[in-house]
Amino acid sequence: MTITDLVLILFIAALLAFAIYDQFIMPRRNGPTLLAIPLLRRGRIDSVIFVGLIVILIYNNVTNHGALITTWLLSALALMGFYIFWIRVPKIIFKQKGFFFANVWIEYSLIKAMNLSEDGVLVMQLEQRRLLIRVRNIDNLEKIYKLIVSTQ
């Protein structure tokens, strides 16, 4: 097993750990889930480039008669990338004392202001930064507003 294979195993393990945390652990942290809203995906061009580069590496490994384990590890990495970028749905998870956005816990007390932009993006001004929340269904913005008002 080469250093390349070890690095591939490390990346596959990291992506698998992230997927397990995102799907199973995060919804159970910090109390029961009050509301989970699916969000719009960001630009997919990065994911196309990532998976495309992995496919090029697989092709290069096969044509140069590289190690079979490397081909399988590259294929597993491409599948993990496909799952994370195209199958997994990003979401915002609201709890009793705060919410998870982009896998980061944010307490309601940190929200200084909330605005709704013309194109349906909820803007939350925090102490240090601004969150732009793009929901998949515009009707979910009303659910978010009602939940935040009722918990404050």
From Swiss-Prot:
InterPro entries: DUF986
GO cellular component entries: plasma membrane
Membrane topology term: Multi-pass membrane protein
Annotated TM spans: 6-26, 45-65, 67-87
Principal location listed in the UniProt entry: membrane
Superkingdom of source: Bacteria
Alphabetical keyword list: Cell inner membrane, Cell membrane, Membrane, Transmembrane, Transmembrane helix
Compartments where found: Cell inner membrane
Annotated NCBIfam families: PRK02913.1
Sequence similarity: Belongs to the UPF0266 family.
Protein name: UPF0266 membrane protein YobD
Organism: Shigella boydii serotype 18 (strain CDC 3083-94 / BS512)
Underlying gene: yobD
